[in-house]
Amino acid sequence: MATHLSHPQRRPPLLRQAVKIRRRRVRDLQDPPPQATPEVQVQSHHFSPEERDLLYEEALYTVLHRLGQPEPNHVKEASELLCYLQEAFQVQPEEHQQMLQRVRELEKPIFCLKATVKQAKGILGKDVSGFSDPYCLLGIEQKVGVPEGSPVSRRRQKAVVRHTIPEEETHRTQVKTQTLNPVWDETFILEFEDITNASFHLDMWDLDTVESVRHKLGELTDLHGLRRIFKEARKDKGQDDFLGNVMLRLQDLRCREDQWFPLEPCTETYPDRGQCHLQFQFIHKRRATVASRSQPSYTVHFHLLQQLVSHEVTQHQAGGTSWGRIAESQAVTILFLHATQKDLSDFHQSMAQWLAYSRLYQSLEFPSSCLLHPITSIEYQWIQGRLKAEQREELATSFTSLLAYGLSLIRKFRSVFPLSVSDSPSRLQSLLRVLVQMCKMKAFGELCPDSAPLPQLVSEALRMGTVEWFHLMQQHHQPMVQGILEAGKALLSLVQDVMGDLYQCRRTWNKIFHNVLKIDLFTMAFLELQWLVAKRVQDHTAAVGDLVSPDVGESLFQLYVSLREFCQLGPSDSHEVLALDGFHRWFQSAIPSWLQRTYSVALERVQRAVQMDSLVPLGELTKHSTSAVDLSTCFAQISHTARQLDWPDPEEAFMITVKFVEDTCRLALVYCSLIKARARELSAVQKDQSQAADMLCVVVNNVERLRLIIDKLPTQLAWEALEQRVGAVLEQGQLQNTLHTQLQGALAGLGHEIRTGVRTLAEQLEVGIATHIQKLIDAKGSILPEDAILPLMKFLEVKLCYMNTNLVQENFSSLLTLLWTHTLTVLVEAAASHRNSSLASSRLKVALQNLEICFHAEGCGLPPEALHTDTFLALQSDLELQAASSRELIQKYFRSRIQQQAETTSERLGAVTVKASYRASEQKLHVELLSASSLLPLDSNGSSDPFVQLTLEPRHEFPELAPRETQKHKKELHPLFDETFEFLVPAEPCQKDGACLLLTVLDHDRLGADDLEGEAFLPLCRVPGLTGCVEPGEAPQMRLPLTYPAPNGDPILRLLESRKGDREAQAFVKLRRQRAKQASQHAPATEP
C-alpha cells in the first residue's frame, strides 16, 4: 500500500501558480522590463459620407412609407421623426430637403400584409360527431368608389371571401379534422395598393365530405346530431358549412398586430361562433433604396441602429450623464418601423443589436450591461443553420474583437476603472459578466472553437497588466537627482504604491474576480509583485553597504517597515518560499544606526520638552505639566519603533530589546535630573514660597506619571512573546535577570525621587500640625474640646485640599500616609506627657477622632486599614482611659473583671454557686449563695475557714448598700452556705455598664487579716427579671470560677493611682492593691 511518502502529493493550485511565477520571475529579474502589449485596434463607429448618405436615404424611405397605426409609445408625426433623423445624421437643412425630395421621387415599395393564422377556439361543431373539419379562406379586398356606410358596403361586410375576392388572390389554409380548437400557424403574404380602401377578409368553413347515412348514424351521439342529419339531407351534396368570418380595415391595424378576433356570423342564428388568433405585420417588397438593393436587411438595420445609438450616447456624454439604453421615442419608432418593414426576424434583430453594441462599446463609453440583452436573445434563438457563411464570420469576428478589447481593459483595469470613480467596481464586474456570458454561448463555442478558456485568458491578462503597472510605477518614481538617499526614497514610494495596490486588490477587486471567474487576483498579484520588489530592494541595500548615515538609515528603516507590512499582506495559506523570505538580513548593518537615532531623537525631545515646561498643571483634572505629556509621547514612539522593528532573529531581537529598555530607563533618569533642575531654576526667580510648593507638586506628579509609563514597558515591548521566542537560544532566567533587573532599577530610582519629593512636602506640614496640637493642649479649660480642635482642623483642611488639588492621587495618598504617621507620633508624645490631665486627654481624644475622619475623607483619603495601625489602636485605647473620669475608670475596671470572669474556665482557685433574680415589683435583688467548692487550703492545718462577702459594685452606684457576709465555716474546703440575701435597689443602676455582684471568698483568720481565697463577678445585667416586667420563676444556678487580680497591676488602676487629688480614686486603688497583695501571697505554684 502506498503511503503519503511513496509519491509526492499534487501541489495545490496556489502552490503551482507560485512555482510558475517564480520560474518566470527568474527570467524577468535578469531581463529588461517587457515591452507594452500592442493596443487592440478598435474599429471606428463613424461612417464615410457615402455610407452615411445611403443610410440616411434608407431611414427617410422608412419614415415616408410608414404603414398602419402607431404603437402606443411611438411617435405619430412623420415630421418629428424626420427632424430627429436630420439631427442624428447631422445633416444640414438644405441637404436634408434635397435628400428628402429625392427619396419622395423614388418608386414606392410593394405594400404587403404578412398575415399569420395561428389558431381558433370554441368554433361551432357542424358534423354529426359534434366536431368540425375547419379551414380558412383569406384575402384582401380593394374597395374602389364605395362610400363608407352605404348599403352596398354593409352587404359586402356580410359577404364571403369566395364571392368578393378573385380566386387567384384568395389563400386557403390546411383542413384540421374533427376539432373545435384548430391550430394552423400558417403565414401568408397579401399584397395591396392603397391601405385606406383595403380590408382583410377571413372566412372559416367546415369541410363537408360525402358519407353514407349508415356511417353518419354510427357517429350519432345526441339529438343535435340527429337534427344535423336531417338538415344535411335537405342541402346539396358536398356543400361546406360556414363557421364565421373576420373582416378588418387595414388602416385600423397597427404596424404589428397580435390578438384574438371574434368570428362573426352572416346571420343571427348562432351569434357566438368562437375566436380566431391572428398576427399581422405590414412589410415592404422591392424597396427602391440603394442600401436595400445592395445589402442584407439585417446589415442595413445594424448600421442604422449603430448610427442612432452613437448619436444618443454622444448626446448623453455631452450632458454629463451615462447612457443605458435607447430611450428616445423617435429612435425606437424608426428602428421598429425599419425592422418591421424589412421583415427582420427577432434573431436577426438581436444579432444586429449585438453587432452594433459590441462595436460601439469599443469606441464609446456606455455600460457593458447593455450587451447582456442581445447575448441572451442570440443564445435563446441560436440555430447555426439559419446563418449564412458571411454572417457566421461577422458574428465570430464580433466575438473575438470584443473579447480582445475586454481583455485589454482587464489588463489595464487599474487605470481604466479607477477607484476614484464610484461606479468603477460595478463597471468592471459588468464587463466580466458580459465576457462570461458571451463565452458560455453555444454560438461562441461553435464559431470560436479554438479560443482558450476565459479564466485562463483573464489570468494571463491580469499577470501581464500587473507587471506593466509595476514598471510604469517604477518609471514614475524615478528620481530626478541620482543618489543613494534619493534612490531609497523613490524605492520606498514604489513599495508603498505596491502595497496600496494590493490593499485595493484584496478589499475590492479580488471579490469581483473571484465571484465572477473564481480567480484569486490578490494572490496572483502578490506573488508577481513580491519578486519584482525583492530584486530592487536587494540591489538598493547592496548599494548602501555597511556605512549607513543617519538620513540613509532613516530611509532604510521606513523601507524595512514597509516590507514587513508588505509580507504580512501575503496569503496565509501559502507554503511556498518567497523572494522576500529573510529580507531582514539585508538591513542587518543598519540596526546600530536605527538604535542610536532612536535614542538621540528621544533625548532631544526630552531636553526640549523640559526646557519649554513652565511647571504649571495642564488643567483642573490634569495635574502634570506639558513635559510629562511630551515624555509620554516620546516613550510611546520608542515602543512603536520597537514594535515596527520586531526583528525575526530571536537572539538579536533580545539584544535589541535590551538596548531599547536600557535607553528608556536612562531617559527616565535623565528626565528626573532635568525636571528638578528646571524647578530650581524657576523657583530661584519666584519670591512666593507657595509657587515653589506648586512646582514641587508638579515635579512629583510628572515623575509619578513617568513611573507608570516605565512600569508598562513589559507590555509595550511584548516581553512574554519575546521570552517564548528566545527560550531555545538563551539560558534559563537570562531574560529575567537582564530586562527585569534594568526595569526594577529604573523604578526604584523613580520611586526614590517620588518619596523624596513627597517627604519634602510633608515636612512643610508636619511643623504646623505639631504646633496646632500643642495649642490644643494649652487652650483654656473653659474651651470645649470640640471648639479647641477647630484651628487644627481648619489648618489641615486648607493644606490637604491644596495638596489634593496639586498632587495626583498616588502621591497624595503617599503624603497622607506620611502625615498620618507623623501626627500619631505627635499625639502619642502629647498623651504621654499629659497622662494625669483628663482635660488634655479629652482634647487629644477628640482630636484623634476628628483626625481619623479628616484623613479618611469619606473614602477619598486613606482607607481604614491604613488608618488603624497598631500605634493608632494603642493611642485610641490610652486616650479612651485617660479622658475618662475616675468613676468611669472604676466602671471600666469592673467591666474588664467581668470580661475576665466570662473568659475563665479553670477552677484552680475554686468556684462558688449562686442563684440570683430581680423582683421589679419590689425592686429587690434576691441572691442565694448555695456553696463553694475546691477552695485553696490557706491555714497551716491544710484547710480553711471560708466565708463570702457580697457587695454591689461599683460603690458609687450603690452607696447606701452595705456589704453582706455569710457565716463562717470551720475547716471546710467545700462549704455549703445555702444563705439568702436581698438588696433593695432600683433597676436602673443595675443595668449600667460594669454593675456587678462581687463575691469575695475569704479565709477567716482570728489573729490577723483575713486571707483571700478568690473573687467572682456576677454581672447584674444577666440577672433574670431585671429587664422584663414579668416576675422571674425559678432562678438558674450559676457556677462562677474564682479569680485573682492581675499580678502585674492594671493600667486602669495605675491611671487612677496617678490622680492624687481624687480621694474616691485613691480609696478604690488602695482596696484593689490590698486584694492584689493578698492574692500574690497565696497564688498557686502554677499561677504565673
UniProtKB/Swiss-Prot annotation:
Plays a role in cytotoxic granule exocytosis in lymphocytes. Required for both granule maturation and granule docking and priming at the immunologic synapse. Regulates assembly of recycling and late endosomal structures, leading to the formation of an endosomal exocytic compartment that fuses with perforin-containing granules at the immunologic synapse and licences them for exocytosis. Regulates Ca(2+)-dependent secretory lysosome exocytosis in mast cells. It holds the Pfam family MUN. It is a peripheral membrane protein. InterPro entries: C2_dom, C2_domain_sf, MUN_dom, Munc13_1, Munc13_dom-2, UNC-13_domain. GO terms for cellular component: exocytic vesicle; late endosome; lysosome; membrane; recycling endosome; Weibel-Palade body. It is found in: Cytoplasm; Membrane; Late endosome; Recycling endosome. GO terms for molecular function: metal ion binding; small GTPase binding. The modification Phosphoserine is found at S150. Keywords: Calcium, Cytoplasm, Endosome, Exocytosis, Lysosome, Membrane, Metal-binding, Phosphoprotein, Repeat. Residues 92-239, 908-1033 form the C2 domain. Its cofactor is Ca(2+). This is Protein unc-13 homolog D. GO terms for biological process: defense response to virus; dense core granule priming; establishment of localization in cell; germinal center formation; granuloma formation; natural killer cell degranulation; phagocytosis; positive regulation of exocytosis. Residues 240-543 are annotated as: Interaction with RAB27A. The MHD1 and MHD2 domains mediate localization on recycling endosomes and lysosome.
